[in-house]
Amino acid sequence: MQASIESTGNLERRLSFSLPEDRLQSHIVGRLGEIARTTRIKGFRPGKVPAKVIEQRFGAQVRGEALDGLLRETFDAAVREHDLRIVGSPRIDKGDEGEFSFVATVEVVPDFGDIDVSKLTVVRHTAEITDADIDQMIENLQNQRRTWAPVSRGAQDGDLVAVETWSQAGEERLPAEGTEKGSIVLGQGMMFETIEKGLVGLAKGEEKTLDVEFPADWRVPVLAGKTVQVTVKVAEVSEPVVPAVDEAFIKSFGVKGGDVEQFRSDIRANLERELKGALMNRLRREVGEQLIAAYSSVEMPPRLVENEARAMLAQQVEQIRRNGQSVGEIPADAHEGFKEAAAKRVLVGLLVGEVARINDLRLEAKRLNETMRLIASTYEEPEQVIEMYRNDPQLMSGLQNRVMEEQVIDWIAERAQHTEEKLSFQDAIRQ
């Protein structure tokens, strides 16, 4: 098969090719024959259904399947014939040279020139899990299970305070009648600092009027940019009651026997997983920034960037909806605001792929299995999760891509000029 190629842009190519009609017809005839031998149709004995009936019932479907399959096969052959390294999905249209002629418009990988990763400068962060980190996590778990006990003393940091508030902005009272009711844990920045500090020391039934400065962009226009008198009245003060780290508490986290050392060991393993992911994210970001700085002048495939920008917009919209917020009507050009970030993401992705290709880097089975088992270990039935990955090609493909990217990022970092910077666990996981 011969396919002609035309350059229609710096990174765009147009392939013109025709499907071999004899192969298409041969495939259709063969497939209809298979169906005739195996299908059961009422009124006919198996294998004795007339060809005309088979054609009427299955002809259009078989022809469509054959055409799609041969189109993919012929397109792939044309790409190999012209040694094209394409990115994204092709746009395939009907050609002008007959029923079986097609034109495929594709984008290709840009020329990055000599990719010398040894010229990059990368900071590689390290961190370790300490006993103090485990203690902190246990304290966090205790706080997650805390209950609240009413007290008669004045409120202090860490207390849960039920409050009633109302504001006076000039002649206007908010709300016009009654009060706004709510609860806050003091010291967590849930209200204006002036209000939280004003509540410290107040007991149930006590109130105080405070001068509070509202920011210019405050959501209530009548308060925005003004200093307003806010009255707070304490309805209830409760102190936290955290459970003891006893056998029952430990068992509630799935540790059989309630053994404290096993509990700490499990927590360490969880923190190690979290730390490993956080350090890889930092390294991915570090390497990505260096690649962007070194190759930002290289033109990116426009359609690939456009698709990435739309995907980023869709991801943000979905996140907003998951948070229970309304999105409203999305402007047709809303994705334009994501194009700069999309171009950087595309640049890094293509460079990582080129580094892997040029240096013949292959996916390491050991690393893939380790990552799969690491993911599975966070579930109650890890072997079922592993089996799910092995039986789902799409799921496995996503994992393979992720592991391969991490493998290449590591490879680049090892060969770049790099320094190490040690962080605490808390600093390391702070993205």
UniProtKB/Swiss-Prot annotation:
Catalytic activity: [protein]-peptidylproline (omega=180) = [protein]-peptidylproline (omega=0)
UniProt source species: Stenotrophomonas maltophilia (strain K279a)
Gene (name only): tig
Alphabetically ordered keywords of this record: Cell cycle, Cell division, Chaperone, Cytoplasm, Isomerase, Rotamase
Listed GO MF terms: peptidyl-prolyl cis-trans isomerase activity; protein folding chaperone; ribosome binding
Similarity comment: family membership: Belongs to the FKBP-type PPIase family. Tig subfamily.
Any one Gene Ontology cellular component term annotated for this protein: cytoplasm
Protein name: Trigger factor
Chief location: cytoplasm
Pfam families assigned: Trigger_C, Trigger_N
Function: Involved in protein export. Acts as a chaperone by maintaining the newly synthesized protein in an open conformation. Functions as a peptidyl-prolyl cis-trans isomerase.
Single GO biological process annotation from the record: protein transport
Record remark: domains: Consists of 3 domains; the N-terminus binds the ribosome, the middle domain has PPIase activity, while the C-terminus has intrinsic chaperone activity on its own.
Record's keyword annotation contains S-adenosyl-L-methionine: no
InterPro entries reported for this sequence: PPIase_dom_sf (IPR046357), Trig_fac (IPR005215), Trigger_fac_C (IPR008880), Trigger_fac_C_sf (IPR037041), Trigger_fac_ribosome-bd_bac (IPR008881), Trigger_fac_ribosome-bd_sf (IPR036611), Trigger_fact/SurA_dom_sf (IPR027304)
Xref: SUPFAM superfamilies: FKBP-like, Triger factor/SurA peptide-binding domain-like, Trigger factor ribosome-binding domain
Domain named PPIase FKBP-type: residues: 158-243
Localization: Cytoplasm
